């Protein structure tokens, strides 16, 4: 850590693989049990454990009976062969919890708002590094210490992911934090680094403008004048209620959004095309509109917008008639089925839907589910062109396992002149906080206030009752 170098994760995995602990969580075996199993079989990866099972070696391990062997076999059949990372939501929560327990700051991939993290990183300023490392080793969430030096240690968490802590002198905390935050490419371009107590001082001593952690992926990156912040959002334009697959009523969602400081909230429940959840037809939307009107009378000046997440049909038409959509304040369009269609076909369907004059935003354009489903084949260059022609904003969806558009695609969209809508896609009052992840993703892509539709006031979005049609 003093030199900016990080021990390769695969070196740690030869001693003890996080995969085994993660598998244990799947099959209901504790971390210590899985660690002992790994040591007894001399295996450190899921694939090695799979081989041991096929060779019949598990039966020789004390305490592994037929029932446990069957559970492990079932878990291995379900276990993904590709390496999984922690989502940004989970990596931030775990990093923050560990940091709070140690009086430290979290760094690494979590601090850079990476969509997936494969290692956590902490930095603690102290004059007693040994005591800090002892405290780290005793944390209930650290199941094993893999490596320990005079001022750093690497442990394995109950999540099956390595966590690295670096103890440094208070006067060099800023330097240590920057190195631990990374990326290695970004930091290497700044070396040699002066000692500094905080990052602001460090950048000043380097003669550079401060670079937010989210942008520290490539060497030489400089920040735009003002990245968008959570406080810049004036409303959330995508959430669900008990009218479809949500768990909060219109009133409950509105009250929670107001508590977060929003000025408005668009209710965007599903249409019937999404057959796996209840969908709203024309009369349902009108009845919901009556309920929204009552909530608005109660909560004014806070505004609940009549919206919909309108599914895109296989032929590119929308799953609601134009006269119904014309009554609404905000229309999100989205594709749920048919994500694996060929590139040209998929792009034609989505762009045709975007040309509907009532469409205002396109939800989760690339259709991915982190760790589970890859992006679809949608041609983003063509999508951007149609977005420019129609004025449809592209969503940065804040659901923890979506974050779609990704930060990389946000950067591409901004370069093309596209505007974004940062949404929670909340299905509960708690889910409204997802917008923080949308903001983090947009920031990582370089988005500023002017790039984001919902930094505007409600009057700029809705010009009259039922004013959801584009200009």
Label the predicted regions.
Residues 1-120, 124-153, 160-164, 173-175, ...:
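Accessory alpha-helical DNA-binding modules that contact the DNA backbone or grooves
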Residues 14-18, 271-273, 309, 368:
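Short linear capping/connector segments at secondary-structure termini
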Residues 31, 66, 109, 236, ...:
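Gly/Ser/Thr-rich helix-start
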Residues 113-131, 135-188, 192-241, 247-261, ...:
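Charged catalytic cores and adjacent phosphate/nucleic-acid-binding surfaces used
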Residues 307-310, 437:
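Active-site catalytic microenvironments in core metabolic enzymes, especially phosphate/sugar-handling
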């Amino acid at each position: 850590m003093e030199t900016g170098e990080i021990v390769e994760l695969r070196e740690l995995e030869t001693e003890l693989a996080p995969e085994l602990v993660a598998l244990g969580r799947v099959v209901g075996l504790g971390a210590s049990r899985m660690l002992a199993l790994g040591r007894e079989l001399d295996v450190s990866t899921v694939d090695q454990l799979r081989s041991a099972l096929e060779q019949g070696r598990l039966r020789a391990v004390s305490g592994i009976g037929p029932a446990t062997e069957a559970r492990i076999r079932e878990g291995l059949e379900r276990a993904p062969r590709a390496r999984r990372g922690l989502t940004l939501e989970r990596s931030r929560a775990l990093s923050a919890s560990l940091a709070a327990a140690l009086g430290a700051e979290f760094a690494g991939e979590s601090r850079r708002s990476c969509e997936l993290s494969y290692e956590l990183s902490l930095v603690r300023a102290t004059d007693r590094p040994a005591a800090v490392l002892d405290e780290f080793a005793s944390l209930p969430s650290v199941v094993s210490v893999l490596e320990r030096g005079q001022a750093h240690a690497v442990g394995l968490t109950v999540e099956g992911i390595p966590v690295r802590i670096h103890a440094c002198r208070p006067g060099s905390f800023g330097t240590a934090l920057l190195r631990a935050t990374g990326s290695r490419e970004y930091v290497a371009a700044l070396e040699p680094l002066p000692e500094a107590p905080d990052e602001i001082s460090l950048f000043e001593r380097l003669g550079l403008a401060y670079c937010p952690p989210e942008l520290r992926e490539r060497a030489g990156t400089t920040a735009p004048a003002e990245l968008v912040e959570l406080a810049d959002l004036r409303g959330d334009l995508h959430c669900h209620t008990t009218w479809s697959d949500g768990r909060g009523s219109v009133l409950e969602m509105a009250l929670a959004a107001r508590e977060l400081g929003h000025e408005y909230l668009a209710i965007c429940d599903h249409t019937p095309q999404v057959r796996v959840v209840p969908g709203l037809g024309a009369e349902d939307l009108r009845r919901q509109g009556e309920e929204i009107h009552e909530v608005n009378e109660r909560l004014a000046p806070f505004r609940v917008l009549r919206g919909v997440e309108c599914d895109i049909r296989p032929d590119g038409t929308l799953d609601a008639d134009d006269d119904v959509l014309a009554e609404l304040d905000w229309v999100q369009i989205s594709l749920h089925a048919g994500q694996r269609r060929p590139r040209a076909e998929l792009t034609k369907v989505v762009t045709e839907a975007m040309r509907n004059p009532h469409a205002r935003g396109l939800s989760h354009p690339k259709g991915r589910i982190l760790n589970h489903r890859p992006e679809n084949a949608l041609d983003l260059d063509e999508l951007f062109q149609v977005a420019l022609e129609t004025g449809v904003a592209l969503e940065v969806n804040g659901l923890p396992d979506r974050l779609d558009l990704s930060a990389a695609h946000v950067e591409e969209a901004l370069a093309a002149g596209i505007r974004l809508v940062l949404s929670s896609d909340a299905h509960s009052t708690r889910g409204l906080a997802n917008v923080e992840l949308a903001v983090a993703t947009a920031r990582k892509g370089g988005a500023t206030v002017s790039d984001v539709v919902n930094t505007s006031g409600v009057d700029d979005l809705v010009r009259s009752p039922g004013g959801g049609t584009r200009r």
